[in-house]
Amino acid sequence: AGLVGSASYENMSGGGGGKAIGFLIENADSNHGTLMVNSTPIVIRSLTGVFPHNFRDLTLVSGTIGDYAAMVVGKDSPINSMDDLLAAYDADPGATAIGGGSVPGGMDHLVAAMVMEAAGKDALGVKYIPYDAGGKAMAALLSGEIAALSTGFSEAVDLANAGEVKIIGVTSEERVDAAPDAMTMMEQGIDTTFVNWRGFFAAPGLPDDQLVMYQDAIAKMYDTPEWEEVRARNGWVNIHNSGDDFKTFLEGQEKVIGDLMKKLGFL
């Protein structure tokens, strides 16, 4: 989009994001030119102690986008709505498992528990089966090992467009243009919303003038056609909050997720 002259990217994997966070903190003075992209798991993994730091140990630059969560079923499943899934669960809770791509207590599990609790079910009673790869989760869905899959909306859209799944519920307040026929949870009487945000963080101690420069560049990004093309293609929603507003947003999510994790016995 021409907003910066050049930029490089490094995928610093390891420790569920902890390696990148630790690197920024431990080498703060020499990394004022580095931004880190992170998402909801920084809140979850800090709460559970997967790594010793949390978002407060970094410079909060800007929240950028959100990816809603979705519940999907196999293309040939008799389940076509959340009402159908809840009816199947009421008839046989043990045989109505929900799968996901994260460990128990991870984001996919928490979303499934949040949705089921909002539907009046006991979140502790939901049978959740984790899978370490999307292919394994899809195989389980198609074989009937799980009745539904908790996943990100953008991934659900890709699977639905490929004819592999049906989206039976989205955790957005309103329908999303990327899948206009997919009903929200709210439409189906399930009073819950959830968004997996993505945002930019910087090393602690970042000078104020450099922070403002980064925030201004991100704000300008939203007005570019290049950004809109990427956003629409992925079904993302713009969630722009900088500095203190970003902190307030993260603290609110930390409380909601923390309360649910305590109820589920993960804290």
Language-model-derived ranges and their functions:
Residues 1-57, 95, 121-148, 238-241, ...:
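N-terminal (or domain-start) structured segment
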Residues 40-50, 113-120, 147-180:
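A ligand-binding cleft/hinge motif common to bilobed small-molecule-binding domains
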Residues 155-223, 234, 252-255:
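C-terminal lobe and pocket-closing loops
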